[in-house]
Regions:
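Nucleotide and nucleotide-moiety/phosphate-recognizing core
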Residues: 9, 13, 58-64, 68-103, ...
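Transmembrane alpha-helical segments that form the membrane-embedded catalytic/substrate-channel core
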Residues: 19-25, 93-103, 178-188
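Short, non-helical or kinked segments that cap or interrupt transmembrane helices
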Residues: 36-47, 104-117, 144-152
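Interfacial segments of multi-pass membrane proteins
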Residues: 51-55, 77-80, 94, 98, ...
Length: 216
């Protein structure tokens, strides 16, 4: 009987987290401005493509929204289903998946970086700042957001498991690594061809676009 009730709780966490993740401010901003974020720029419904298509302010808004929606999903799962041991982890991971594969957008969403950060924030603000610092260091060292994102999808669950001893929870938190890696395979192909926009695009837009144009 307990197994059946736990199964329903898990399914509720998955559904709740997934639907919250499906909320896409990047798509809504694009629609308001007259473009489809799924087919424009880098064809990604996330903060980085919003920067490319709508500017830094819009991109920052999208990043913050995506972070906080994942944090809210985790907290909601923990509050509504306190008897389920891994409620916040399951809800948070489901939110990341919903963000990446939103049913309302034909399963063409973002790449999960900001939402992953929101899950970290739900665990601890201090750990969020630490993971953010590591992500920034990796990003600047590699000059590619894709490398930073995929790296953090591994570093975060390993850190969680190491510091808490809760490796079952860490295993749940590691689930997004697979879809995040798959989502970034084309980025890695472009990196190998020298066609991927570098992180320096954020402050050297014209220079970076010229480089891509020349290499194309």
């Amino acid at each position: 009987m307990k197994m059946t009730s736990d199964l329903w709780r898990i399914l509720l966490c998955v559904l709740m987290g997934y639907l919250i993740g499906c909320i896409s401010p990047s798509y809504l901003i694009g629609r308001k401005k007259g473009y489809d974020v799924r087919t424009s720029g880098s064809c990604n419904a996330g903060a980085s493509n919003t920067v490319i298509m709508a500017g830094k302010a819009a991109g920052i808004f999208v990043a913050l929204f995506d972070i906080l929606k994942a944090t809210a999903a985790c907290k909601l799962g923990a509050v509504l289903l306190p008897e389920l041991e891994y409620a916040w982890q399951i809800t948070g991971v489901s939110c990341v998946v919903g963000h990446m594969f939103p049913v309302f957008l034909g399963f063409r969403g973002g790449k999960g970086f900001a939402c992953l950060g929101g899950v970290v924030l739900a665990h601890s603000a201090k750990v969020f700042l630490l993971m953010l610092a590591i992500a920034v260091l990796i990003g600047f060292a590699s000059n590619y957001i894709a490398i930073s994102t995929v790296s953090m999808s591994v570093i975060w669950p390993v850190y969680y498991g190491t510091t808490t001893g809760n490796w079952a929870g860490a295993a749940i938190l590691a689930i997004p690594f697979v879809p995040i890696f798959i989502k970034h395979t084309e980025n890695f192909r472009r990196i190998s061809r020298g066609e991927e926009l570098r992180l320096s695009y954020l402050w050297k837009k014209d220079t970076e676009l010229d480089r891509i144009t020349r290499e194309d």
